[in-house]
């Protein structure tokens, strides 16, 4: 099975899990959420991506005992005691890599998009400040990855009206008809710009943006809106870090 097929499996798992959670949520407690919240309160919808990345890291030569998620993925911070990352790689007491897997489906794109931006920026600031302060022992700068799966829908791909009471938004955030409509780019385009800037500003080593609609997504269908945010490049960057570690270990004589 090639990488694209394996990624399709993770996308399919995401949508199938959301659908199952929406159907069963509240069946045990009797408390029923409504709307999109019912899709996600059960968690685990991004587990397919986490499992795929774990497998790819192991295939690159890093022992499974070095790859951690769940209760063993916490790392100390600088502005807070600890942060539970979605996946962490620690080998020979050195922090090699860490990842965040995020998703967003409609209908509430606005507040959720802003929350995702603030969360990622805060996590990165906390991580690199902790690294600067030698919180992770003898570790060299770790590889930090950010993966976003966004629902491909009218709400995420249409221009958005934006308030400008004092100053205009930056040019890259303006829709092509901005001068007439005073609308910003879509949330999909915002996420594309955001992921690109995370890497440009060296807050994350690599970022990936995947889009999928909830109907064809059940079959594993997806698109990648930007060539520089593709999953293949994301994986290549990560496995490159693993190769770098293995070569360094060989030179150390281990």
Question: Over which residues does each language-model region extend?
Answer:
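Glycine-rich, often proline-containing surface loops adjacent to acidic residues and nearby aromatics
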Residues: 95-106, 145
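Short N-terminal secondary-structure initiator segments
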Residues: 28-50, 97, 140-159
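Acidic, metal/cofactor-coordinating or nucleic-acid-engaging core segments within structured domains
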Residues: 110-216, 220, 224
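Charged, low-complexity C-terminal accessory regions
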Residues: 1-25, 29, 175-254
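Short helix/strand-bridging catalytic loops that position acidic/His residues to coordinate divalent metals
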Residues: 74, 102-115
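Charged, often glycine-rich, active-site loop that binds/positions anionic groups
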Residues: 71-87
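Interdomain/boundary linker segments immediately adjacent to catalytic/signaling cores
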Residues: 1-69, 75, 254
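Active-site beta-strand-loop-beta-strand hairpin of nuclease catalytic cores
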Residues: 81, 88-98
